[in-house]
Amino acid sequence: MTLTTINLFNNAKDFIIIPAGEVIFEKGGIADYMYVIIEGEVEILIDGKFLDITSDGGIIGEMALIDSSPRSATAIAKTECKLVPVDQKRFEFLVQQTPNFSINVMKIMVERIRKLDALVVSLR
């Protein structure tokens, strides 16, 4: 995400601190929130297998929030993390009122799809 988008959340009062090693959400869980990572690193795992690390300025949990599906992966704090939870109502407000936010979410999702495409090709 760009600095402008990070600044949308930097002064948020509703941040949460997650200690290193704590599960943020689990695969199959209900998606009430996506999270903006203000500080820290989060590991993304599927069935115990490492998929990715997301850090400062990244987002996690957006897919399940967008399509109301169960979580597709587990997220674990690799380091202590400062996260801002974003529920459906807040997400929709940000999408409508802050086009830059929407574009950055799309860019992140496209980047993840490209990584997965490359992985699929490498497995053939």
Indicate residue ranges for each PLM-predicted region.
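Cytosolic regulatory regions built on CNB/CRP/Popeye-like sensor folds
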Residues: M1-R124
